[in-house]
């Protein structure tokens, strides 16, 4: 760890300790007693009510899961107690949630979302607490020996998205956050595009929490050109805002900028222009966004979308939908079509099967970690390939060594629903390991 990284992390942790009493949105879900075995305490965190990405459905799904398993006697006789915490989309908030997990003696952090990996992983590593099934948004989730990811994160999504777009797109404009994490995205998308001998995407950084994106939308359209052009946006919750700006662009682009060769990239007239295809990845565009923006009349109709899991209407989600229907108690935060909710469900599936494999009266973080490191195999009912985190299962890709699930799905919006464009999973492992 560099001195700069260490000092930054220490500053975050110190600030978290000082501000812990101000943390809001934390709670614990009591449940029915699970029998004579000791309760198991875990934590799920996510940002809520912030100006950027919010994931309130993830802690809500964790609480729903606890109500379900506790109504059936707990996990292998253990009552499941779920702590929740608002990560606030800040390093201080993330570190505070992690330190709370340590204080409350959580044996794992499960199915959580944070963009502040450096801030939360250090406290967890110091306490030996495993991080199971994080959303996959940070580098630390794929490098820390105590992280057990259930998907391939943004790396898999972007590489897969490049592969999906390569079949139909000539030039691709990528609109992505102007952040350190966002700086990685163009190379990942290009890895997928170049697998099909396509040139790299035009990189268009954008402020993550902007209220409109007219400038970036204009540039993206101009750069995509008129023949087989595609515009991909990966801006989290602000993706909808971007495509709203994109949809509102005038038919004539007028003052088009020059392209990289110095020639005019748009004649200023859209006569005969073929519609530019739009695209994104799950987490930036999903069924809830499509529903909110008009369903069959949504601007996302026809969009290509790359995901980690099967489409929301797939029968493999039946068990989750049943649990949500019976135990979410009309909590509208728990949307079974939301990618965050789905990730939390899969993460708790991992936790449940690992605890059951222990067959112990007391469950500790060390026992969970040992089980995961020594070959605990988790079946998710077709939501992912079988999951296991032994050394030989790790992809070992540069920057993302702990990826074990390098499968993605290709989807498309048809008649207002996300449906499979291509059946089954697509393996992006070779693309990630061989990228330049």
For each feature predicted by the language model, list its residue ranges:
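C-terminal motif of bacterial Sec signal peptides marking the signal peptidase cleavage site
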Residues: 22-25
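Extracytoplasmic "Venus flytrap"
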Residues: 28-65, 72, 87-92, 178-182, ...
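Extracellular/periplasmic Venus flytrap/periplasmic-binding protein
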Residues: 145-270
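Segments of small-molecule ligand-sensing domains
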Residues: 331-341, 352-418
